Amino acid sequence: GIDCRLLLVPRHAERALEIIRLLKQQPLTWHQRSQNTATPNSVSIQLADTTGELARLTQVADLAFVGKSLEPNIGGQTPIEAAGIGIPILMGPNMTNFKAVAKSLVHSGAALYANDENQLKALVLDLAKDSKARAAMSQAGRDWHADNKGSSARIAHTILAALD
C-alpha cells in the first residue's frame, strides 16, 4: 500500500455540509479544518472548508485531481494554480470550461487524463510509486505556467491593437 492523505477543497463553502454527510458514511478518519481543532496525525482525509488557505495547503501536495472533470460532472475546475506550484495534475476528460488549458497541460507533460474512476485510481497508484514521473510532471507544470504567464495581457494588447 501507499501512505497517503486526501485534501478535499470544495470550490463553494456551502458544499461543506454535503461533503460532511458523505464523509460520515465512509470508514476513513477525517478532519474538518473550520472546527479549529488540532488535526490528528492519523487523519486520512482533510476537509479544507476554510478561506484563504488553499495556496498554503496545496504546497505539500504530491498530486492534484481536478474536480468536476469525471462523469457525471462536466466543465472541470481550473488546473492553473496546481501547475504553477508544480503539482502533477490528473483530470477527467470533461474539461470543457478549461479545454485549451487542459490540452496544453497534457501536451506539456504536466497533466494526465483519466477516462474514468478506475483509470484515475491506477494513475494515482502508479504516480504515488514513481517519484521520477512526479518530478518530471512537476517541472513541466512550472515550465508551462512560466511560459503562459502574462498571456491575458498579451491577448488584451492584441485585441486593443486590432480595434485601433
Q: Can you say where each PLM-predicted feature lies in the sequence?
A:
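Nucleotide-activated sugar donor-binding and catalytic core shared by glycosyltransferases
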Residues: G1-D164
